[in-house]
């Protein structure tokens, strides 16, 4: 489930920007990167898509990081969606891609990574998983600093002050880190 088309637009825009920058700066190389926000908790934002005027929703209980969600049960959804797709070459391509992405992978992160790679891998897209343990190891010094110094919070407050003539759209918190374990995702508060 990629949710609204925003998922695809973000990736396509990133690939196009990398191409434009390469044309403008031919001696430099630009790599399109898709940051998969697998630690996010907002399943309601991504558990559906619209097709032929109909909303297809994955009705599943969700808690914790969405990337860790099991894809178990999507075979029932696939049957309904397959029927709506009908027959034909394009329908078969979409069915195959859905099966390979969501029915052959055990969690949403792996399924989404596979789908994005199938669609955009030939354009040099690099996919980063925010919940990857090896990636998080590199982030440890920044996490420690954030916990003890509240660096991001201070910078955001400074920026808000500099842009005081504009309406604040998001109110910052002192710590924007979470403790995660299995299906648990809790904000860290001191």
Model features per residue range: what roles?
Residues 1-190:
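N-terminal targeting/trafficking signals and adjacent low-complexity tails
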């Amino acid at each position: 489930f990629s949710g609204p088309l925003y998922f695809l637009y973000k990736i396509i825009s990133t690939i196009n920007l990398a191409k434009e920058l390469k044309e403008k700066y031919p001696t430099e190389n630009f790599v399109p990167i898709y940051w998969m926000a697998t630690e996010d908790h907002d399943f309601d934002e991504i558990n559906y898509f619209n097709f032929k005027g109909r909303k297809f929703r994955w009705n599943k209980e969700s808690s914790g990081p969405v990337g860790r969600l099991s894809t178990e049960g999507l075979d029932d959804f696939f049957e309904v969606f397959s029927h709506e797709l009908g027959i034909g070459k394009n329908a078969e391509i979409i069915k195959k891609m859905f099966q390979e992405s969501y029915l052959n992978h055990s969690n949403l992160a792996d399924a989404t990574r596979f789908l994005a790679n199938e669609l955009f891998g030939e354009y040099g897209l690099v996919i980063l998983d925010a919940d990857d343990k090896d990636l998080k190891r590199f982030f440890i010094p920044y996490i420690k600093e954030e916990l003890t110094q509240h660096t991001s919070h201070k910078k955001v407050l400074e920026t808000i002050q500099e842009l005081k003539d504009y309406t604040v759209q998001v109110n910052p918190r002192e710590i924007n880190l979470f403790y995660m374990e299995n299906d648990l995702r809790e904000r860290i508060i001191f």
